[in-house]
Amino acid sequence: MTFLHGADKPLQISRGEYATDKDLFPVTMAACALVSARVRDQAIFIPSWDVQELSETPSETFYNAAVRYSNGCENSKQAYTLNTLRCFALLALTAIQYGKIREMQLFLGKYHTFVAMDGLHDESNWPKDIGIVETEERRRLVRYMIQRKTSANDQ
């Protein structure tokens, strides 16, 4: 998941910022859902990770929290944040991990709709005040999701 590259993300999560940041919470829950599902399916091969601890909370608990807290963002009149887009990308990946193709299509659809609504496929429409790290994160997310869309069309 190269679109979660930012060095500040682990720090934000370790400090518990996701508990009070309504933009960070859903993407954190979505990331936890994917990791937990991959651990459960024995698809994680990082020796330093404590697989037992990562298995304690079912993936669906994180997934449902991410879905619940991301609901309603469709009604926002504001531009969609990078974390909102990441959340939908991660939910789509987790749905693939669960074998739920319809849900994968739902979250891919939300992602691509929001990108289209704000013209975020064009870097000139991105916020002007983002730094190099966020610019690269956005580029990686766009590339990754274009690849997923292509793969999903083959389903």
Language-model segments: which ranges?
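Acidic, Ser/Thr-rich, low-complexity intrinsically disordered regions in fungal proteins
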Residues: 1-155
